[in-house]
């Protein structure tokens, strides 16, 4: 069976984000492993465009992006070098009300030496909790990560992340990793979400690892008094909390580019990054929406608007091609 490039890309995305091993995922999809890895090698070396089977027929030039639009895409890429082709395509569509695909952006940037080969990695371990969430505030993930302030030593960032939307509900930079630091962060999360004012029956569940602060009796008592059910991940399997683990890695990749000599400077940078992550960073796993879009329920409206923009853009390109050919 011959698959179009769009379906090959979708299959690769499914395998990347599957909680099952690669072999089992491919078996369920009915895709031979040799075929998948041939696609994946082409994708890793040339991006989405490399998945297209070469045809002797001429390209459909009617869908070519106009030169003026191409220049605007290039300018955005220069101004936002940290954005991937996927993120650039979504941001351009949202901000300019003009649809461009990830493959088109990748091809354009590649032609102008503005991109290297993509660093796509097939995920081999489960990165999602087994009971899927269906709405915000059903399940929160929490964990600590280490950050250093020169001359002051190590500090510990405690974070509460909403499982469904990836939204950072609350965070706190702590000097210890005690149960009281966990409860302080959770108190901030309850206040920020407004759940401190709701019925106890509507409180989220909490997912953590088995660190000493999370198995403490004081935390259990605090959670019990607030009707928050505590779930703990499987020992020696941190990918149960894959979303917050990836958040920590994303944070450190940005934050640790600089040295910090004052805790206030570190907190300022964390606050700025959390704001960017929540409100401006597009996540492929949530339909290229931002965590805030999903958490606050704006997703359906945004996705409907993108689909409208896509239809109008393609219709306009067809019309312009016909006018030029007449």
Spans of model-derived segments:
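Mobile-element integrase/transposase regions
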Residues: 68, 98-99, 107-161, 167, ...
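Acidic/histidine-rich, metal-coordinating catalytic segments
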Residues: 186, 198-216, 236, 287-292
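C-terminal domain-tail junction helix/linker
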Residues: 2, 217, 224-228, 249-326
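Short, amphipathic alpha-helical "recognition" segments used to contact nucleic acids or chromatin
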Residues: 3-20, 70-79
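RNase H-like polynucleotidyl transferase catalytic core
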Residues: 203-210, 224-243, 257-263
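Short coil turns linking two alpha-helices in DNA-binding domains
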Residues: 32-35, 101
């Amino acid at each position: 069976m011959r698959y179009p490039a769009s379906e090959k890309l979708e299959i690769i995305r499914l395998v990347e984000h599957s909680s099952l091993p690669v072999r089992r995922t491919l078996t369920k999809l009915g895709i031979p492993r040799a075929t998948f890895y041939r696609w994946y090698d082409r994708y890793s070396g040339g991006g989405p465009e490399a998945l297209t089977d070469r045809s002797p027929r001429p390209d459909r030039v009617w869908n070519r992006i106009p030169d003026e639009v191409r220049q605007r895409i290039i300018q955005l890429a220069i101004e936002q070098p940290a954005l991937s082709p996927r993120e650039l395509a979504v941001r351009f569509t949202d901000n300019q009300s003009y649809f461009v695909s990830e493959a088109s952006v990748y091809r354009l940037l590649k032609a102008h030496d503005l991109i290297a080969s993509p660093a796509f990695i097939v995920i081999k371990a489960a990165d999602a909790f087994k009971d899927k969430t269906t709405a915000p505030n059903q399940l929160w993930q929490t964990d600590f990560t280490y950050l250093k302030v020169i001359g002051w030593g190590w500090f510990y960032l405690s974070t509460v992340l909403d499982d469904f939307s990836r939204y950072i509900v609350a965070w706190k930079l702590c000097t210890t990793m005690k149960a009281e630091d966990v409860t302080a962060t959770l108190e901030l999360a309850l206040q920020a979400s407004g759940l401190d004012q709701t019925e106890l029956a509507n409180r989220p569940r909490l997912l953590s690892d088995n660190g000493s602060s999370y198995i403490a009796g004081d935390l259990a008592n605090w959670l019990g008094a607030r009707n928050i059910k505590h779930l703990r991940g499987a020992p020696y399997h941190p990918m149960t909390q894959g979303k917050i683990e990836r958040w920590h890695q994303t944070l450190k990749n940005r934050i640790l580019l600089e040295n910090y000599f004052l805790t206030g400077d570190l907190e300022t940078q964390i606050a700025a990054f959390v704001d960017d992550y929540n409100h401006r960073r597009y996540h492929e796993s949530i339909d290229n929406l931002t965590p805030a879009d999903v958490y606050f329920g704006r997703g359906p409206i945004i996705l409907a608007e993108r689909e409208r923009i896509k239809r109008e853009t393609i219709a306009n390109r067809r019309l312009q091609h016909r006018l030029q050919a007449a």
